[in-house]
Amino acid sequence: MKVADLEKEVQKQTELRVMYRKRMERTQDYLRYCLQIAQENGILEHIIHSKGELQHSPLSVYNVSSITNSPRIPTHSPKHQHHPNLEAIIDQAKINGWYINPTEIQLEDKIGQGTTAEIHRGTWRGFDVAVKCISPEFFRTNANGVEFFAQEVETLSKQRHRFVLNLMGACLDPPNHAWVVTEYLSTTLKEWLYGPGKRRRDRIVPLPPFKERLTRVIEIAQAMQYLHEQKPKIIHRDLKPSNIFMDFNLHVRVADFGHARFLGDGEMALTGETGTYVYMSPEVIRCEPYNEKCDVYSFGVILNEILTGKHPYIETEYGPAKIAMEVVEGKLRPTLPSRDDGEHLGELIDLIRLCWDGTPSTRPSFDTITRILKSYTNRVLH
């Protein structure tokens, strides 16, 4: 076996160890939750004081539930027995009240289309909601499709931040009813900046005022700081304007956690080429180990885009593959705004350069980014 093959195998085994460790941690969390339910409903106390009886007639969760009139912990559907992560999430959703039956949702107009899902406006229990319907084809052609879906739902279900998309519930029955139900938001950062449609050089809508754009940037940084400072930290891995939604008051919601990854302190990820090339960091393109600083790179591209009002690399005729090659070699970054455009952008330009630096350790944390942006706003705009 060649050295390169051995290295790939080592990387693969390392990735598997990390994945199984995370699954074990999630299972332990779920078991602790079950123990808490048992204690709160007197089930554990009943078992402890009935040990002699248990030798002859073991009490199941169902027996004890009927004795105490407490809620039963849901059983697993045989349909999902090969996907323990999804089973655990279904149980948590039913216990915590965010499991949604597809018949409860009235699907309305399609408002978005991605490579793996359609987004519909809908109504659920009187609320306007957005329903992300994962394509059944995605599960048929992707061996890890159920895991990706389970991860997105699990990640969203744990987030409580005003600038992170709010999960209302989910239909957890892939492949036909893998639906993520969230608050309904009418536009994205991409549409706010450029209007509807594909990338183009010419503007079709006015560029929003500088102060409003800067406010949106700070909100994105705050959302990402929240995600990165969780334990374990959450790496988004696909941060871009089309994955950042906006409410009626134009406040942002960071969304689409289908590529998100949990990392412990000091831990590195190995899965390469995750995300969109235009916003992807060099180390991810090269399939090298990476950490949360890959999101900082993406943010740097977005910050530059918001300041210039131009799509990254729109001035070139390069396709995604060419852009990726030039970025990896350090030859290409989006065109920076001019320092003499009257907005005192020198400090922000320096921040952009740090964010998309080729060396991940040079890039600032989102804590630092947020403080720099707030300080700049207070000095320049107030």
Regions found by a protein language model. Name each.
Residues H120-F138:
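Glycine-rich ATP phosphate-binding loop
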